[in-house]
């Protein structure tokens, strides 16, 4: 390819396509300054890198689609500023304790029947430092899902973990575990929460990796971080060597401290996804919250800017797009591979 017509920073970044080696943080910071139509040139490169290398360490699929179930909702003692489920906030959401196993099975069956092969059980709260009766119920749910839907990839997001629960999840065959660092670690305290530390999340990630559990870990953009800090978060994930990187865009929710936050521009979101792909050529990069509500008409552009996964069927407290619609969406995206 003749790179002479490209911006010098983009031309230099084509090294990722040729070698599969990631860009440096210094290169990422320069790419973040690209204006206007150059963002589409950057997105084009990220799409090529995704197509060549992005099957990911989480599996061989070209597009990683997953669905989650909010199995325990609200009354969380942590004070995450963006979250509707925190009891410190005043969002109007449904509140309930851990659901029964049959409810989880019904939801999982429906998702699997619609063609979704990854299903996650999500609970509100700090997490589980030891195996208590509630955590044991979650383990029993995982076993039931394996028995009834052996081809389903069963995942979980249960908060911070101690060594015993992490070992138990591995023993019960969990496929992926989600726990996000949200922002660059040194801004976690003031941008996200101060009732727990980001180090507790990182310790959980290390425990999961010690037990050979694939880690799904990413962040949220639009909570007050700068682009430079967002890039620092992307490279912090590189150091943690996670398998799946979900990137969320803040959806401001009434009753939370970030309710009036101005949304990020489409161009800035696209640029972030493209840079993340160039920093993580071989990973699954998944677009989660904000796909429908913030990107709207442009959501397909992110799947052509480095993303190769998405959350379908709904989020924890807000509705997403129907799985059938997303299947049609995915089939159209595949024509650009």
Swiss-Prot record:
Its EC number is 2.8.1.6. Pathway: Cofactor biosynthesis; biotin biosynthesis; biotin from 7,8-diaminononanoate: step 2/2. Its cofactor is [4Fe-4S] cluster; [2Fe-2S] cluster. InterPro entries: Aldolase_TIM (IPR013785), BATS_dom (IPR010722), Biotin_synth/BioAB (IPR002684), Biotin_synthase (IPR024177), Elp3/MiaA/NifB-like_rSAM (IPR006638), rSAM (IPR007197). Residues 58-288 form the Radical SAM core domain. It comes from the Bacteria. Belongs to the radical SAM superfamily. Biotin synthase family. Catalyzes the conversion of dethiobiotin (DTB) to biotin by the insertion of a sulfur atom into dethiobiotin via a radical-based mechanism. This is Biotin synthase. The lineage of its organism: Bacteria, Pseudomonadati, Chlorobiota, Chlorobiia, Chlorobiales.
């Amino acid at each position: 390819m003749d790179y002479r017509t490209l911006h010098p920073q983009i031309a230099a970044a084509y090294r990722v396509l040729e070698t599969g080696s990631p860009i440096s943080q210094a290169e990422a910071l320069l790419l973040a300054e690209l204006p206007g139509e150059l963002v589409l040139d950057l997105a084009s490169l990220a799409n090529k890198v995704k197509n060549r290398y992005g099957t990911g360490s989480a599996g061989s699929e070209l597009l990683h689609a997953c669905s989650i179930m909010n199995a325990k909702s609200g009354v969380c003692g942590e004070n995450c500023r963006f979250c509707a489920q925190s009891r410190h906030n005043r969002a109007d959401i449904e509140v309930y304790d851990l659901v029964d196993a049959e409810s989880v099975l019904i939801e999982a069956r429906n998702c699997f029947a619609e063609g979704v092969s990854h299903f996650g059980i999500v609970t509100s709260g700090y997490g589980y430092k030891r195996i208590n009766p509630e955590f044991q119920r979650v383990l029993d749910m995982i076993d039931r899902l394996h028995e009834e839907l052996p081809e389903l990839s069963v995942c979980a997001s249960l908060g911070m973990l101690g060594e015993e629960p992490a070992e138990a999840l591995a023993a019960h065959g969990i496929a992926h575990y989600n726990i996000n660092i949200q922002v660059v670690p040194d801004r976690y305290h003031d941008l996200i929460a101060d009732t727990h530390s980001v180090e507790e999340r990182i310790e959980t990630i290390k425990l999961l990796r010690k037990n050979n559990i694939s880690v799904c870990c990413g962040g949220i953009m639009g909570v007050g971080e700068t682009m430079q800090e967002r890039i620092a978060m992307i490279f912090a994930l590189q150091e943690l060597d996670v398998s799946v990187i979900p990137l969320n865009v803040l959806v401001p929710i009434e009753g939370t401290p970030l309710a009036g936050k101005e949304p990020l521009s489409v161009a800035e979101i696209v640029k972030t996804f493209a840079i993340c792909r160039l920093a993580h050529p071989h990973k699954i990069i998944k677009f989660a919250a904000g796909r429908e509500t913030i990107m709207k008409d442009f959501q397909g552009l992110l799947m052509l800017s480095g993303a190769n996964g998405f959350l379908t069927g709904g989020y924890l407290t807000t509705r997403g797009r129907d799985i059938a619609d997303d299947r049609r969406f995915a089939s159209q995206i595949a024509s650009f591979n």
